[in-house]
Amino acid sequence: MGKFCLYFCLIYILFSASSGNPSRCTLFIGASSYHSDPCGSDHPRCTWRLDLFSLTRDQSLSPPCPDLVTYSQYHRPYSLYVFPHWITKPNRRGLGYYSASYSDPCAIQCPYLGCQSWTCPYTGPVSSPHWKYSSDLNFTQEVSSISLHLHFSKCGSSFSFLLDAPGYDPVWFLSSQATQAPPTPAPLIQDSDLQHILEPSIPWSSKILNLILLTLKSSNYSCMVCVDRSSLSSWHVLYDPLKAPNPPDPKAQSILRPSLAIPASNVTPPFPWTHCYRPLLQAISSEHCNNSVVLPPFSLSPLPNVSRPRKRRAVPIAIWLVSALAAGTGIAGGVTGSLSLASSKSLLREVDQDIDHLTQAIVKNHDNILRVAQYAAQNRRGLDLLFWEQGGLCKAIQEQCCFLNISNTHVSVLQERPPLEKRVITGWGLNWDLGLSQWAREALQTGITLLALFLLLIVVGPCVIRQLQALPSRLQHRSQPYSLLNYETNL
């Protein structure tokens, strides 16, 4: 009996642990935290969608190093290439995606003097095991947004992101920790509440207002209107009774008014203001609060009247005749233009060779500039080491720090451009070479010219033949305009 109770308790503990709240991984930067999608041992891939500008603002409020330089003004005009700082120098493929091998991460040391993307100078010893790119951590990045994927077994460590630029790299220091998702309350919206919205006869304005009312009642994570915390600064308050709507279209019906005012206490609002958005829970809570619902402003405008279809009208026969003549002239002009383009192929080859030589010279100069930038960065770090006690070179001379950003995008695009001959002459209609010899090309061109003239003769020939056949009868008619009535009389 005792063994049976022990087995029953173990089964109950395992079942309760497996059916508990889903876990997740939380990133901490400065005083802010970012929760991943639900992940754990069953689903080990934790995913975040991060905004680099928001990370920069969060880190500036509580920087890991006292004299850490903020790079919000530096990297804004450029495309960002971000990767963890323990990666070796990657082979760039495309414009922002990497395939890299991992080395051990480097410890963070203050004051931070900057580092190259592929090295970690002036940092402490190795403190973490080997990580693999494909399974432990990977990401994709588009301009200022990054999608990060981290294995749940690696949650609990600290790492950083760097901007791929020579010299002092913009850096974001992040730490991770496994957390539990808050309990999900029962939904307050029933399926019967959605029938009013799904009816096709209900106007759009009534549907949207009911959708907002149902959203205010929802307090679970499957709410019908999801709020993104990174975009709250650009959204507006739902209702303001002190301002009248002023839509650009007189026929448009203003649903949400862009305002930042709270309804007055003596005015009865059309919505229950007892529901508010909780950033910590990332959901709409039913607790009492004084703020309003945050939604983007928009208005509904009626669709314009569809224009009536135009009636087809008969085209006069003269237009067909003129079109035929124009087609013949166009064929002759097209043949002439194609022949002239074919004769300039040798010129394109010479120009393409000159462009190839210029491209090689530009690439060599670009490599030399990169070497000079590396030498300058090494000298800069050496001067910072000399002025370590004074906070670095820039703080010692009391001048603004200057950074050099060398972009490889334009050089890579220049190298990947196809030859000029392929870009200018691409189709058979403009390329008369076809791998033939000189006499074969001339014979082909002559044959096409004769064919065009023959087609023109077929179009115009029948008209000319009819006119020539009718010419003798017309001349005979003009030679005897009058006939004699009687040869025997003098009348």
UniProtKB/Swiss-Prot annotation:
Residue ranges that the UniProt entry lists as topological domain Cytoplasmic: 466-491
Keywords for this protein: Cleavage on pair of basic residues, Coiled coil, Disulfide bond, Fusion of virus membrane with host cell membrane, Fusion of virus membrane with host membrane, Glycoprotein, Host cell membrane, Host membrane, Host-virus interaction, Lipoprotein, Membrane, Palmitate, Signal, Transmembrane, Transmembrane helix, Viral attachment to host cell, Viral envelope protein, Viral penetration into host cytoplasm, Virion, Virus entry into host cell
Placement of sequence motif CX6CC: 394-402
Keyword NAD attached: no
Glycan-linked positions: N138, N220, N290, N305, N405
Signal peptide: 1-20
Function summary: The surface protein (SU) attaches the virus to the host cell by binding to its receptor. This interaction triggers the refolding of the transmembrane protein (TM) and is thought to activate its fusogenic potential by unmasking its fusion peptide. Fusion occurs at the host cell plasma membrane. The transmembrane protein (TM) acts as a class I viral fusion protein. Under the current model, the protein has at least 3 conformational states: pre-fusion native state, pre-hairpin intermediate state, and post-fusion hairpin state. During viral and target cell membrane fusion, the coiled coil regions (heptad repeats) assume a trimer-of-hairpins structure, positioning the fusion peptide in close proximity to the C-terminal region of the ectodomain. The formation of this structure appears to drive apposition and subsequent fusion of viral and target cell membranes.
Protein name: Envelope glycoprotein gp63
Species for this entry: Human T-cell leukemia virus 3 (strain 2026ND) (HTLV-3)
